[in-house]
């Protein structure tokens, strides 16, 4: 059945849910995509991701074109104008089509009386486009990050903050992990090339391939059979550092959606793995991934701060703690993070990470390894967190594998490389 709803209206409503209501894009977008049908789902995704990526510039332009912002019940129209501006500024959609469809979105929003206003604002932009596009690259809005985060990055990484911000504003590459139980990386790459696609092997990570162009997983040879998993190369680095072995008791804590759980079992098929996450909905995806790769693990819902509740007095040979964090290293994949996070969240997240680390440490066997990981680039969650942990726990030793000036390894997001990530490998004496 043909869907009749205005796509620009749906994009505006989806963006409003993220920016005004604090919902995550990955939670609200799938339902929105179902309402427009397969053909338009990709365009809806492009508009939502694009507006959230470039929000400060769009806000700045609206501020130049309108004397006062739209508030209250008119707020959705504000986001509809943003959708219109994004199309005119950053896409190849013909201007006449972008304009007509966006103006018509006012009817779908039950604000037909504002069609003239929307049309006027977008046409005014067209008249001043060159001048506005030049001016919007002068102030802080050019960096496309909230002020608080920009200040934290400048303070933490005075030499690298621009590189981090630039990478955050790019479209992310699509990384794959080849399941070595089925194929070597080179053998699967041959299958991919036979299907007409290209990928590039990572020089350090033996299972990792970067697709030349992202595609739907259904187009990847053997995806449903578990030959391949979509996982960023930085996340793949966790299991290489954890170094699991057959026969070991291994805990994957904060395991959802299961990419690292399955990677552990690819590396050590005879390991006894327990995968734990606090979020029941996301935990279901761990089970789905295990099923797709025909692997076995004990999957449990549980809070990392109270391990005795879900593992009793069990001690593990290895623990992978992919801690809850600000996700500031994966902004390019989830641009809504910039608008969902607040400055005060960082201290709260650091406190939560500390509680989980301290709670789970007694469940590591003497001689065992705990790998602490985050997808953050903020020191409070990373080397500062681990520095404080080492001061509290005399029986913990950090295995130095990176820059010796600070504990652990900090990776920044890179255009053709991995996401921003942090790792610290701790051994119990």
From Swiss-Prot:
<dbReference type="InterPro" id="IPR018314">
    <property type="entry name" value="RsmB/NOL1/NOP2-like_CS"/>
</dbReference>
<feature type="binding site">
    <location>
        <begin position="254"/>
        <end position="260"/>
    </location>
    <ligand>
        <name>S-adenosyl-L-methionine</name>
    </ligand>
</feature>
<comment type="similarity">
    <text>Belongs to the class I-like SAM-binding methyltransferase superfamily. RsmB/NOP family.</text>
</comment>
<keyword id="KW-0694">RNA-binding</keyword>
<dbReference type="Pfam" id="PF22458">
    <property type="entry name" value="RsmF-B_ferredox"/>
</dbReference>
<dbReference type="InterPro" id="IPR035926">
    <property type="entry name" value="NusB-like_sf"/>
</dbReference>
<keyword id="KW-0949">S-adenosyl-L-methionine</keyword>
<dbReference type="Pfam" id="PF01189">
    <property type="entry name" value="Methyltr_RsmB-F"/>
</dbReference>
<protein>
    <recommendedName>
        <fullName>Ribosomal RNA small subunit methyltransferase B</fullName>
        <ecNumber>2.1.1.176</ecNumber>
    </recommendedName>
</protein>
<dbReference type="GO" id="GO:0005829">
    <property type="term" value="C:cytosol"/>
</dbReference>
<dbReference type="InterPro" id="IPR001678">
    <property type="entry name" value="MeTrfase_RsmB-F_NOP2_dom"/>
</dbReference>
<dbReference type="InterPro" id="IPR004573">
    <property type="entry name" value="rRNA_ssu_MeTfrase_B"/>
</dbReference>
<dbReference type="GO" id="GO:0009383">
    <property type="term" value="F:rRNA (cytosine-C5-)-methyltransferase activity"/>
</dbReference>
<keyword id="KW-0963">Cytoplasm</keyword>
<dbReference type="Pfam" id="PF01029">
    <property type="entry name" value="NusB"/>
</dbReference>
<dbReference type="InterPro" id="IPR029063">
    <property type="entry name" value="SAM-dependent_MTases_sf"/>
</dbReference>
<feature type="binding site">
    <location>
        <position position="322"/>
    </location>
    <ligand>
        <name>S-adenosyl-L-methionine</name>
    </ligand>
</feature>
<keyword id="KW-0489">Methyltransferase</keyword>
<dbReference type="InterPro" id="IPR048019">
    <property type="entry name" value="RsmB-like_N"/>
</dbReference>
<dbReference type="GO" id="GO:0003723">
    <property type="term" value="F:RNA binding"/>
</dbReference>
<keyword id="KW-0808">Transferase</keyword>
<dbReference type="InterPro" id="IPR049560">
    <property type="entry name" value="MeTrfase_RsmB-F_NOP2_cat"/>
</dbReference>
<feature type="binding site">
    <location>
        <position position="303"/>
    </location>
    <ligand>
        <name>S-adenosyl-L-methionine</name>
    </ligand>
</feature>
<dbReference type="GO" id="GO:0070475">
    <property type="term" value="P:rRNA base methylation"/>
</dbReference>
<feature type="active site" description="Nucleophile">
    <location>
        <position position="375"/>
    </location>
</feature>
<dbReference type="InterPro" id="IPR054728">
    <property type="entry name" value="RsmB-like_ferredoxin"/>
</dbReference>
<dbReference type="InterPro" id="IPR023267">
    <property type="entry name" value="RCMT"/>
</dbReference>
<dbReference type="InterPro" id="IPR023541">
    <property type="entry name" value="rRNA_ssu_MeTfrase_B_ent"/>
</dbReference>
<comment type="function">
    <text>Specifically methylates the cytosine at position 967 (m5C967) of 16S rRNA.</text>
</comment>
<feature type="binding site">
    <location>
        <position position="277"/>
    </location>
    <ligand>
        <name>S-adenosyl-L-methionine</name>
    </ligand>
</feature>
<keyword id="KW-0698">rRNA processing</keyword>
<dbReference type="GO" id="GO:0006355">
    <property type="term" value="P:regulation of DNA-templated transcription"/>
</dbReference>
<dbReference type="InterPro" id="IPR006027">
    <property type="entry name" value="NusB_RsmB_TIM44"/>
</dbReference>
